[in-house]
């Protein structure tokens, strides 16, 4: 059974979804990665919890720039001790 998400994870996912619904359509596709950075952030928050999910999302956003080729960059698998409680 999956571990329930913390309220902070839900809040962060909600903020990313608001970005996907309202801001992303205005600026168009710019992400160099698959999955997109916003989808990656949601997957990381769901899989790893708030703290590690935010850390992974921040690292991913810092890699998403014109000098990086991009490509396929999935969320790393969950280690048992990594998941926030």
Swiss-Prot record:
Where does the protein principally reside? membrane
The record describes its membrane topology as: Peripheral membrane protein
Q: Name one GO cellular component term.
A: plasma membrane
Has the keyword Cell membrane been applied to this entry?
A: yes
**Keyword Cell membrane in record:** yes
Family annotation (InterPro entries): Membr_insert_effic_factor_YidD
Read off the Pfam families from this record: YidD
- What does the UniProt keyword field contain? Cell inner membrane, Cell membrane, Membrane
Cell compartment(s), UniProt: Cell inner membrane
Describe the family membership recorded for this protein in Swiss-Prot or TrEMBL: Belongs to the UPF0161 family.
Job description of the protein: Could be involved in insertion of integral membrane proteins into the membrane.
**NCBIfam families, per the entry:** membrane protein insertion efficiency factor YidD
- What name does this protein carry? Putative membrane protein insertion efficiency factor
What does the organism's lineage look like at the top? Answer: Bacteria, Pseudomonadati, Pseudomonadota, Gammaproteobacteria, Vibrionales
């Amino acid at each position: 059974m999956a571990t329930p998400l913390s309220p902070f994870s839900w809040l962060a996912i909600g903020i990313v979804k608001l970005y996907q619904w309202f801001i992303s359509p205005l600026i168009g596709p710019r992400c160099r990665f698959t999955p997109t950075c916003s989808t990656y952030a949601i997957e990381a928050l769901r899989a790893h919890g708030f703290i590690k999910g935010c850390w992974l999302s921040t690292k991913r956003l810092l890699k998403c720039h014109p000098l990086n080729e991009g490509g396929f960059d999935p969320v790393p698998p969950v280690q048992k001790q990594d998941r926030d409680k």
